[in-house]
């Protein structure tokens, strides 16, 4: 059994699978939480309770006792960078040891001393100046270089997660993940990743941005404004409580004012306590402005990092905010590029229909991501191949 927990700002989701390779869902749970803000734990007790409730749901559905979990998270505390690891190999064939050395050097060159490594993802290898090599094993050369994408977070972040999961709930954490890796795994095709594409995952607390090119991740960034920012804009402009703003956003929100009807919605003014009405057009104008700010931030980030010309496949948006009516039209207008909504790609096994929603892209994709890593480890450990050795080294480093 494999259990994955996704710690989101608005919810703690967990999934239990009994066959990762076939994506057979044994149980799934999603529980609201008040203990996380913008991806960071702000209340140990509340977060622990949400985790406990979610795990309890899984155990009741499956009849299994869960002892070990894999934890995925995002948040402003996550950073990333691209790094290089050069090694001199002499005039000989590239060996597993050479590749491990290159990866090790790349993973230690740019990670700040107060951070801890979360993921090491090879972008490409370069042998004697020749780029674009996915597997240099056995090639002849003098100099090998590994180009990698590193994702890291503060040690305190891991400590707080460990406290909620291991100390309070008595569960063992097997692996930590940056949840955006999962979202990309089940919403993007290999062709899109090869050509060059940007994935925008707009959750409740943060917007996660990743770019894939040449089949590999080459850029990632966590941005501070997301679904809660839209909710706050509605609450402030209409002078209503946040919970009511969230409710009407989900039920009546529209990303393009021109698409909204003139239906009148009942709301309660928080200042006077009096009931009043607002049209869906006015609501849509507020939503459109807030979402425009979020997407503009994403587009500017892509342009500022020189990536605009490297994403000919355009943009894919996922996460809970992708459920907003009209978001594709707004994205098309703003990017002047291909802009689509990313849904989890699964084999539609029993109990999984509820997962085919943008808000569950990360946790569904993490199942695929985890299964791939396990398959690599098994296959190459059996043959003592390079990937198995690299996976083993990365696990020991993380």
Language-model features: locations:
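A short beta-alpha structural unit
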Residues: 186, 313-320
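Short glycine/serine/threonine-rich phosphate/pyrophosphate-binding segments
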Residues: 12, 184-185, 202-210, 324-325
